Amino acid sequence: SVGAGVIYGPSYRGSDDYVFSPIPVVQGNLGGVGISPRAGGIALDFIPDRDGEVSFSAGIAAKLSRNRAAQIKDPVVRSYGELETAIEVGPSAGVSVPALLNPYDSLSFNIDAVWDVAGAHNGMSVNPSITYFTPLSRGIAVSLSVSAKHIDDDFADYYYSVPAGGPLPEFQAEGGFESAGGNLLGVFDLDGDVTNGGLALIALGGYSRMLGDAKRTPFTSIRGDADQWMGAVG
C-alpha cells in the first residue's frame, strides 16, 4: 500500500511552534520482503511470516531526519542556523504475537538501531517500541504504540548543545533517553474491508515527552516545550 498525508507537529524536536508537513506512507510486501512505516522512513523485513503464528522480523531501517533543517518558526532558534539533513540506517528486529484477545489482533515488539551515514550528526539512536493492533470491524482497525528513543553523545551534541556567544545560555548536551511517548492510529477502509489493500483513510494522534538533555537544552526549556503533540491524516 502506498499513500500520502499531512502531519501537524512541532517545527523542531522540543519546539512549542507547530507546522504542517507532507508525509508519504508505504506498507506491505514486495517480493517476500515486508515493508513497514517508520517516522521519516521505512523498515524492511527479510523473514517470511506465516499467518496465525508468532512471527519474527529482521532487516534494515532507513530514516530521514530533518530536525532543525527547515521550518524553524522561533526566531531565536533560527538565529543558530539550519542543520544538515541526516540519513539514518541500521538493523531492525522484532517479534509479533497474534490472537491475544481476538483471532485478528496482535502485539508487536520492535527495535531499530540507526546510524547517520550522511555526515550530519554522525551519531546513532536506538528506538524500541511496542504496538497493539486490532480490528474494530471488517472495515475499521486501530493500533496503539508506545516508544522511546535513546541517543548517543554525538547525536545529542549536534541537536541539543548551545554554543556560547548567542542569545541563549551555553549548554553542552550528552546522550541518554531523548523522548518517550505514544501514538494512536485509526484506519477506515473505503470499501469496508481492511484486508484487501484498497483505498483507506487514516488518522493519527500522538504525544511524546522530551527527556534528559533534550528537555534541559535551552532550545526546549526556554524557547520550546517538553510536551510534544502531533496529528496526521491521509
Task: Please report, for each region that a protein language model flagged, where it lies by residue.
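Short loop/turn motifs that connect adjacent beta-strands in outer-membrane beta-barrel proteins
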Residues: 1, 14, 33-56, 98-106, ...
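Residues on the lipid-exposed face of transmembrane beta-strands in outer-membrane beta-barrel proteins
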Residues: 4-8, 24-30, 42-48, 60, ...
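Structural signature of outer-membrane beta-barrel domains
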Residues: 9-11, 63-67, 98, 114-118, ...
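Residues that define the transmembrane beta-barrel architecture of outer-membrane proteins
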Residues: 18-24, 52-54, 83-89, 122-126, ...
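Glycine- and aromatic-enriched membrane insertion/assembly motifs of diderm outer-membrane
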Residues: 18-71, 84-112
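Extracellular/periplasm-exposed beta-strand and loop segments of Gram-negative cell-envelope proteins
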Residues: 69, 79-84, 116-120, 153-163, ...
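A contiguous pocket-lining binding segment that forms or flanks enzyme active sites
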Residues: 122-169
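Predominantly the C-terminal beta-signal and adjacent terminal strand-loop region
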Residues: 187-234
